[in-house]
């Protein structure tokens, strides 16, 4: 069966309203896509997990009168002269198979591979993390996640404790455990992230060494040898008092989710208590690492 797709450029403020309206007028499915290839990170409590510039994509069956759909969208003021949209016919495909074909094992550093569960691992002697793309939030494909994974791979984590602050899928905590860490803690504001991290830890056989907490439920005396936080520059600066207290004396800190243009302001926030290393840059994103200073 063929389908007709309409794609409308919108904003995160309007996307959900448009989605609801499209479903009311007969769409069989509605999805959101980033208009500018920017990543989604953890939202603040109560916020919708959307991009700043969002495309709303709706599928209708092939017999749908799309001129009438456009008329209804305009009548409801979801389309105007400033709204870009595109209508096209879509072939029926095995969408699940096509989606799966897009994901391949990826290597980070010298030892670490992230592999979808339906793929054979390229090196059985490597450190292999099995992680399937899904609703939560980090599978290694974005430069910030890659920078953090490569940093963890470069550390000697044997018998170390690790905190993954803003754990999302749990990818960083799980990678640390499989790279030799004694134990890890994942912290997030989103209950869905806690569930996803636990599921992924079970899949990788490390759930017995991973503790998970919502951010407002973490122990007050929590500290670790290594702390990694892949969130955003603004929250990293705002959360400096909290994040810095999580690092043991001489412990390692890794921060990412930071645009290169924001690196200096984040460094300025942390340099008072951390001896920072040169900033690592990939594409327009960067990673800041350092050690907690001791008096």
UniProtKB/Swiss-Prot annotation:
GO biological process terms held by the UniProt record: methylation
Keywords attached to this entry: Cytoplasm, Methyltransferase, S-adenosyl-L-methionine, Transferase
GO cellular component, one term: cytosol
Annotated positions binding S-adenosyl-L-methionine: 145, 166, 188, 230
Compartment annotation: Cytoplasm
Stated role: Methylates ribosomal protein L11.
HAMAP family: Methyltr_PrmA (MF_00735)
Record protein name field: Ribosomal protein L11 methyltransferase
Native source species: Haemophilus influenzae (strain 86-028NP)
């Amino acid at each position: 069966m063929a389908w007709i797709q309409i794609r409308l450029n919108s904003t995160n403020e309007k996307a959900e309203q448009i989605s609801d309206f499209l479903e009311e007028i007969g769409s069989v499915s509605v999805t959101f896509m980033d208009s500018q290839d920017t990543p989604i990170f953890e939202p603040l409590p109560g916020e919708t997990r959307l991009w700043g510039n969002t495309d709303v994509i709706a599928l209708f069956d092939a017999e749908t009168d799309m001129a009438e759909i456009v008329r209804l969208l305009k009548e409801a003021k979801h389309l105007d002269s400033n709204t870009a949209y595109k209508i096209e016919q879509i072939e029926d495909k095995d969408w699940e198979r096509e989606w799966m074909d897009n994901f391949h094992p990826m290597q980070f550093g010298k030892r670490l591979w992230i592999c979808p569960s339906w793929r054979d691992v390229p090196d059985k002697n490597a450190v292999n993390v099995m992680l399937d793309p899904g609703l939560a939030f980090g599978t290694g494909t974005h430069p910030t996640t890659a920078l953090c994974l490569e940093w963890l791979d470069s550390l000697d984590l044997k018998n170390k404790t690790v905190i993954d602050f803003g754990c999302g899928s749990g990818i960083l905590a799980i990678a640390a455990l499989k790279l030799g860490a004694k134990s890890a803690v994942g912290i997030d504001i989103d209950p869905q992230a806690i569930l996803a991290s636990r599921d992924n830890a079970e899949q990788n056989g490390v759930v017995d060494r991973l503790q998970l907490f919502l951010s407002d439920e973490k122990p007050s005396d929590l500290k670790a040898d290594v702390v990694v936080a892949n969130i955003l520059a603004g929250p990293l600066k705002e959360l400096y008092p909290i994040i810095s207290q999580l690092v043991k004396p001489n412990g390692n800190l890794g921060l990412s989710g930071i645009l290169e243009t924001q690196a200096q302001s984040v460094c300025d926030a942390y340099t008072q208590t951390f001896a920072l290393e040169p900033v690592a840059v990939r594409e327009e994103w960067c990673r800041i690492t350092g050690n907690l200073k001791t008096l």
